[in-house]
Amino acid sequence: MDLETRIKAYRFVAYSAVAFSVVAVISVCVTLPMVYNYVHHVKRTMHNEITFCKGSAKDIWNEVHALKSLPNSNRTARQAYNDAAVTGGGAQSGSCESCCLPGPPGPAGTPGKPGRPGKPGAPGLPGNPGRPPQQPCEPITPPPCKPCPQGPPGPPGPPGPPGDSGEPGSPGLPGQDAAPGEPGPKGPPGPPGAPGAPGTPGEPGVPAQSEPLIPGEPGPPGEAGPQGPPGSPGQPGADGSPGQPGPKGPNGPDGQPGADGNPGAPGPAGPPGSPGERGICPKYCAIDGGVFFEDGTRR
């Protein structure tokens, strides 16, 4: 009973270990693709974000370098009334190595709302007498500037969204007729046709000759008719003679046991028995707990 209990316990432990192992393997097979897909999605998103950030940083640095390399000719209007000469004017110095003009102006904005009329200003003081002009009335035409070389191409921008699906194409031209194929197999027979029209009536036959009547042979017997109704019951018969005696019946059940009889007379004396064995003295061995005899046997 103890061995069977141990076998059942070991069997339960083995089945439990196999079941947990199967569940663990199935869980790994299910969760590993999901984790890999999620990590791949995060990696792709981070790569797109880093690419976009790098592109934005490059655009900002290009704008900063472009602003640094712009000429100072746009400050002419601010220094028009100063005594100092206009700085950075490539047209005055006569050199056109770095006089790249700015790009064309952008499109005109929408006109603003008309402002409110201002108050009339106070009359100004009489001005000082003017000085004679020191420069000729006609401005000196500056030499034309050399066209600047085309800059290097900028970094590729981020991929744009997919375009709209195009319009469906026009249907193609009809194909040419193929060559006639080989004749097909013989078809199944068609349905039966409609019955034909009745034929024309035939000519009248030859009249029969009159002969004396001859009686024919008797026909075969007909089938048996249905069974008739049952007749009325007859008169009761006379009593028969007595039969032979029947066989002997089975034995009856056993009766109650009788009372014990008187004791019998004592029997004669039996034959004398065989002589007994020689007596021995047993010795006890304390090594294995056995009892040995002088004749060397162990009983």
UniProtKB/Swiss-Prot annotation:
BP GO terms, sorted: collagen and cuticulin-based cuticle development
Has UniProt tagged this entry with the keyword Translocase?
no
Quote the InterPro entries the UniProt record gives: Col_cuticle_N, Collagen
**What segments bear the compositional bias annotation Low complexity?**
164-181, 251-263
Keyword Repeat found: yes
A Gene Ontology cellular component where this protein is annotated is:
collagen trimer
What GO molecular function annotation could you give as one example from this UniProt entry? structural constituent of cuticle
Q: What's this protein's function?
A: Nematode cuticles are composed largely of collagen-like proteins. The cuticle functions both as an exoskeleton and as a barrier to protect the worm from its environment.
Query: Out of the domains of life, which is the source?
Result: Eukaryota
Q: Quaternary structure per UniProt?
A: Collagen polypeptide chains are complexed within the cuticle by disulfide bonds and other types of covalent cross-links.
Return the SMART domains for the record: Col_cuticle_N
For region Triple-helical region, the annotated ranges are 216-278
Q: Provide the family line.
A: Belongs to the cuticular collagen family.
Q: Which parts of this chain are annotated as the region Disordered? A: 105-282
Q: What species was this sequence derived from?
A: Caenorhabditis elegans
Pro residues bias spans: 129-162, 182-195, 215-233, 265-274
Q: Which Pfam families match?
A: Col_cuticle_N, Collagen
Q: Which UniProt keywords apply?
A: Collagen, Cuticle, Disulfide bond, Repeat
Q: What is this protein called?
A: Cuticle collagen 34
